[in-house]
Amino acid sequence: MIWYLEDVERAICRARKKIAPVVDGVVNDLNLPKNTDVFVVGGFVRDAVFCELTNTKFEPKDIDLILSKKSDFSQNNNMLWKQENSFGGIKLGLKFFPEVDIFDKYFDCPAIIVGQYFDFNVNSIYYHNKTRQILAAAPFYGFTSNKTIELESFLISSDKIETLYKEPSLVSRALKFQVLFREKYGIDARLSWTILYLLQNMDKQTEQKMFEYTQQKIKDENLRKQVIEQYYNIKTKC
């Protein structure tokens, strides 16, 4: 099916109104600095616009890819989320998938990556510009290839990449933990990655190592206690 550009643009405007609250929620959940420019790329935007074009129901769940940039953009950039005609950085009517040249041209910045095409997007960013920082990542749906991607606790950090190679089976566990933590325990997503790391690694280490790790990762004493408490509560249930 082919749509005229005007139809697509109108669908984008309608979709943005439904996407915006979800984006705001994720931005708040990640505790991004105020006035941080946020980009939404991938299937989340694609699905929202497609539903508007076909007059079908759209139920936002997870955002596929979020990229944040702290500095201002040039006048000719049409990819800012806050601009009326933006489409999350994806070229209108051409492809519904992120392109390496887009990353290279616009996203020379730290990135926060969430979502379905996790491995493709990380590789596009990492191999095209190996100096680029990946601040956080969470594969909600799983890998789209057999590549092994770096994962760790992914607490937001502005000064370094926090990664650790893990086996691909971590992804399926990560999804279960993410749902469990958020829905059953109401635990912040960032803390769930720390707990997941502990569950994956602390069987081979002493409790002292665990406390040292959490002290290093989480400065807030109350949050640190919560992580350790939930670690013990959940360890035998997952």
How should these model regions be labeled?
Residues 1-238:
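Catalytic cores of the polymerase beta-like nucleotidyltransferase superfamily
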